[in-house]
Amino acid sequence: MKLLYIDNLKFLKGKEKLKLFNNFDFNNVIKLTQKDIESYFLKSFRRLFKLPDLKLVELQEKVIQRTKAKVAILGSKSYPNKLKRIYDPPFAIYYKGNLPDCSLLSWAVVGSRKISKTLAERTREFSSHLAKNGVEIISGFAIGADIEAHIAAINENKRTFAVIPTDIDNIYPRQNRKYVSKLLEQGGGIITETLPFDKIQNYFFAKRNRLVSGLSDAIFITYAPLKSGALITAELGLDLGLDVYVYDLDFCGDGAVKLHDFGAQEIKTVKDLYALLNIKYVDSNNIEDDSKECCNCKNVSDVLIGELLKEVCK
């Protein structure tokens, strides 16, 4: 109850919520007024905020229990270290299944909702090769490029992680819910920072993209027009110092081409992908036994962002 009550204090940043969580018990925290909170943090807010409704918090707790969702709190052992890199990391994330393994390489494979059949096939192809070589696939579970990336990992019987904009009991979009059980069976996870009963807002999608980039070591965009949400993910990734890749410039969309103009690297073929991962490419799609260490941080440190990965895996 205390955790959910504090997480409902939407006007506070994640680290401020954590400070309340660590220093107040439930009976005391529910007595705090906005003025008390302002005094505690030595700051004032521009407008009055409605404090959490205890009945709503009780209902949220029941949803968490009914869905058997897990909660990772900022600063806890279960909270992903990579996520701590982002601006204002969430106080709590709610998830089903598992969270990404920090010791493994993870790529965000994202793109537009509206993609051609050919681009959908290319997204699956690249994601499949990443997954079967030990790279965990992170994406936003949206229709289009996102779900194609997830499906590729599922088809390879590998782990993939879906970050959703809605709450854990209202997985969005509905048409992709049929993939949830298989995704979870294979050790993946559904992840969100949205609380039960929160009415979805447009900015929730940007918050979702922020988590996608935060959980990833590199970002690969297969198709993105100029107004694609995938560009937000890429820009956030660049802010974190991540490598950003785009598919063939003849097909990847104007938004992805613009990213290339700002330094994103082009990946045209699966062979290009294997070269980035420092793995020998075999035409039969069979990888030599002595090359299957792409998920080891030390083996990829000279290829992508190994130094950063070493830090967050400590």
UniProtKB/Swiss-Prot annotation:
Biological process terms in GO annotation: DNA-mediated transformation
Disulphide bridges: none
Gene3D superfamilies: 3.40.50.450
Function of the protein: May help load RecA onto ssDNA.
Family membership: Belongs to the DprA/Smf family.
Protein name (record): Protein Smf
Species, as recorded: Borreliella burgdorferi (strain ATCC 35210 / DSM 4680 / CIP 102532 / B31)
